[in-house]
Amino acid sequence: MCGRYGLTGLYPLDNKVDLAADDVSLSIFKGNVGMMNEAVAVIANLTPFRGPSADPGTAFELGYMAGRGKLCLGYSNDGSIYVDRVRRAGEVRPGATGLVDAQGLAVEDFALSDNLMLVHTLDLYKCPLVTPRLPPLDLWYDLTAFEACVRAATERLYRTRA
C-alpha cells in the first residue's frame, strides 16, 4: 500500500534474524532500531493489543521516533475511550483522587483514546490519532485508518520536500 502512495514501507518482520542465535530478542531489537533510524516517519498501529492499551513495543517505537524528530502518525481500529476499555476489562470505580481499578491503582481518565503520552505525541506533529467512524468488521486486518495515515504522511513528506 505504501508504494501506491510513493512511500517505502519498513515492517519489523522484514528484518533478517537468525532464530537459532542465543540473542534472538536482542537481534530483533537492534534490527528494529536500525529500521527506525533509516525511516523518515512512523505510522504506529495503536489498536489495543492484549489489553486496553496499545502494544508496548509500538509505544516505544513512537516515542523513539518522536525523540529523533521524525514525523509521527498513528491509528487505532478501536476508537473507544481508554477508560471505557479498562472498564470492559474489569472493575473501575471512583477513588479519592480519580478513578481506580480493582487493585486501587489510578486509571487515566482524560477522555482520550489511549495514554496521554501516546495521543499527545501525535498532537505535537499535528497528526491526530486516526480512528474509524464505525468499528471495522475486522479489528486486526482492516487497513482503512492505516491508509488514511499513509495519505497524510505522503502529503506531509512531499509538501516538506517541495
Task: Go through the PLM ranges and name each one.
Residues 1-162:
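Conserved catalytic or regulatory cores that recognize and/or transform ribose-phosphate-containing ligands
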